[in-house]
């Protein structure tokens, strides 16, 4: 398997016997080079000594030497700087575009690495590397968690950057879309993002001082001001209480004024949702947040502490929703503030990644550093992923740790990408 051969070369998991080319010249690996995952040679800028002469260039790796021709490398000038061709089976000589024969070296994947890799790929246990985790050094765990935490923030930065592009380059709008997405808290996240992209924020800004009009636009664009979206047994009550009709009339006026089109309300998911998470409640909280001018990027960037972030993101519903979860359904009075857990998730998934992304965009490292510091101050998430890692023996002390472990599961374990994982590395090289 070529991937394992790459791995053996990259990590110098080499036999103890002397390495030689197929024509008997001694090979010494000074630097295996930089692993290239894109088009071109497999390793850039490697340093190898062949019969005492130092060669600096690229290394290409194949299962069989004849793959050189099958892949067309003999006609590709990008491979002219290859100084060593490494193969498990050397079944022929190879030449570059200039007709020069390349030095070749036979290399086999050590049997224990092959066996360990098969275990990782075939076991039904999850995570497959669970047996080795208690034996990992603190340094290994700490350095890997730090790298994963950065990866997680970088991935979220890419998402935010794409939203900014969809918003015509507006990072202010991208923040609103990101905030709205995370108000979906998983089940309705995609729908909230679609909804936010359908909100003409420049138009809404003209009515920013009127909470009722903001809520009318937010509810209307969500498609929730059509009578057939109200459960049948509540429709008459919704018409009688007056608020539904007032919002609908206001929205119809504003929709005509700003040429707005509502989204399809069928996109909203109500199944298995607690009433506290119903779209009506979250939209009212968002309207209040927007009305209080707490949904802006400039306010976020000014936050330097967890308490300031909590104050910024805290919101509650408008008076009607204190006694309702949907139109027409009367309930006990409750101001419906965002819970502590919801605030925590908004800080972890919205505010802190946005600080990091803005830091990258503006080349302000202090904002990136602040994002890391804030993550370390927050309590970790409590979900099935985190509990799984805790049972395996990994420490979870902060939101930084929990984000790192979510990244580990989603980007490595779920994809069985053990060859890029540092825990996988420890598992593969262990002799058992």
PLM regions and their residue ranges:
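Short linear interaction motifs
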Residues: 63-65, 402-403
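N-terminal accessory interaction module
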Residues: 44, 54-55, 60, 66-94, ...
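N-terminal ordered "arm"
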Residues: 7-64, 79
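Short loop/turn segments at secondary-structure transitions that flank enzyme active sites
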Residues: 65-67, 90-92, 111-113, 185, ...
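Hydrophobic, aromatic-lined core segments that form the binding pocket/scaffold
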Residues: 148-404, 417
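Low-complexity, highly charged intrinsically disordered N-terminal segments
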Residues: 1-4
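Compact, glycine/acidic-enriched structural inserts
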Residues: 80-82, 86-144
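Cysteine-cluster motifs in flexible loop/terminal segments that predominantly coordinate metals
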Residues: 403-432
